[in-house]
Amino acid sequence: MSNEGTNTVLKNPGSNQEEADPDSPSSLGDKSKLDELADSTSDGSQANSGRGIAFWAIFISLSVTGFLSSMEGGIMSTALPAVSRAVNAESDYVWIINVYFLTSAAFQPLYGQLADIWGRRWPMLSAVTIFAAGSAICGAANNSGTLIGGRAIQGLGAAGINTLVELILCDLLPLRERGQFMGLLFLFIVVGSVLGPMLGGIIVDKTSWRWIFFINLPICALCFGLLFFALNLKHRRDDNSTSLQKLKKIDFVGVLILCVAVTLLIYALTYGGGAKYAWSHPVIITTLVLGIFGHGLFIAFEASPWCSNPTTPLTLFQNRTSVAAYTLEAVQILVSWGALYFLPLYFQSVLALTPSRSGVLILAFSISYCLSAAIGGGLVTKLGKYRLVHIISFAIMTIMMGVFTILNRNSSLAVNVILGLIAGVGVGLPNASILTAVQASLPDSLNAASTALFAFIRSLATVFAVTIPAAIFNSRFDDLLSTSALDNDVKNSLDLGKAYQQASPDFLHSFPAPVQDQIVGLYELSLKLVWQVLIGIAAVGVIASLLEKDLECRTEQTTEEFGLKDRDEKAPKKSEV
């Protein structure tokens, strides 16, 4: 058994003093309480084998809520053209998507803090209510400004949902058992992500686009009802504080800095490298630099004496295991979403498959991804270890991105299906256990802050996962296009980022065979560079997983502040809400 368990204490050679392992939660939290768990967590014998009705009621309500948020995240992908035309969005159409990601990312750390101050129940119910209000505004919108405003409110609600669903599950389960339930929760989220685009297309074709948003209202009502009755959770932190005292503890300045920084970054990534601005344009350079500086300023403020109650305490970064695990989450999102967006581009531009056939092929990757996440979470629960799972997973990712570089127009459909299945295993296996690695080195009292930061990194990485490969692809394609022998009319239809939009068999078949061959060759070479960049990103994941310590997964909670309320506990007083 490794000596790097939750209660590890390292002795300094040549000294009688004991030095706490910085990766051990006992060095960061309640040491005496954690030390009492040393023997009980070593063999996992105290892991609970069964769960009561109260737990399953909460788990089902969280799963339905997670399904709702993930479905909304994808439903606009197929409906955006129709919605944009209906509200005359014109060039503002991109913000119908991006403002949702902006607010859902920027406010996640705030929800973690609110959950610590007010408990989990009311922030969660508020998030569902805000999401429903945003959906209603979007559905009733008659212009792009109202629609974008509604989407911003939707994202504000989604920020709470995405953070608190995982956080509440962490409160209910000891560390060792979280992986398998996170895997099950992920199944609901993936189903929502898969159904979202399909449902968006059906609604636009068969009914009014407004039902893309109005359909959320009955689901929100169901979620609110389930959560209202199921979330019978305790909260014993600051019970005697008044509402005004609690408000004063919110890190408003930090949240404002983060919102501005995220907005600047997303603006630069949205407009850079397109028809409006080149990457070298002063506007893009300025917003990008200010966005990066803003994130640095946010970290500096959180560590400063002016921030007495930070949304993101630097304690989260004071050991290598949590830092490595946060890095793994960013890498996993960058690689998985990069593959999810650019494999269909390969299918449609190089293999000249229709969007429907492309969708069928990508199912191999998606299904493997989904099932592997559940299996990976179960493995970590069974073994009580996560490091080996992560090393194997990120090694598979790196190898598969390398294999993708040799894909070309002659690759068979069977080969593509098999490669998709293997790649799905690589990106799926670690999905439900990376948060476990983060929290293995931290006390359970930091669950809210660590989960909120985890969700924020995931959301921001999702934006980068599309924009970074797209910028690389467009830049490479434009360079190759400028030196090709294609005539100017063909070049004008493909330059300045239009190659991604034109990736379809209909576009290819509109040209003579020799021209088709040249265009396909440009796509092959441009995609090859994307896969090569993803190789490097995945390799960072291998290095980060090697830097992790394989800390013991605790089989008992180390805090009694949160979790299921005991039967004999009274309902909270109004002052506690």
Swiss-Prot record:
Any GO CC annotation of this UniProt entry: plasma membrane
InterPro entries assigned: MFS, MFS_dom, MFS_trans_sf
Record bears the keyword Glycoprotein: yes
GO molecular function annotations of the record: transmembrane transporter activity
Induction, as annotated: Expressed exclusively during fungal penetration of host leaves, the time point at which plant defense reactions are triggered.
Transmembrane segments: 52-72, 94-114, 122-142, 155-175, 184-204, 211-231, 252-272, 283-303, 333-353, 360-380, 388-408, 417-437, 453-473, 527-547
Gene3D superfamilies tied to this protein: MFS general substrate transporter like domains, Multidrug resistance protein D
Residues glycosylated per entry: 240, 319, 410
Record's function text: MFS-type efflux transporter; part of the gene cluster that mediates the biosynthesis of a tyrosine-derived cytochalasan acting as a fungal signal recognized by resistant rice plants and leads to avirulence in Pi33 resistant rice cultivars. MFS1 might be involved in the excretion of the signaling tyrosine-derived cytochalasan.
Family recorded in the similarity comment: Belongs to the major facilitator superfamily.
Protein name, per record: MFS-type efflux transporter MFS1
Organism name: Pyricularia oryzae (strain 70-15 / ATCC MYA-4617 / FGSC 8958) (Rice blast fungus)
Gene (name only): MFS1
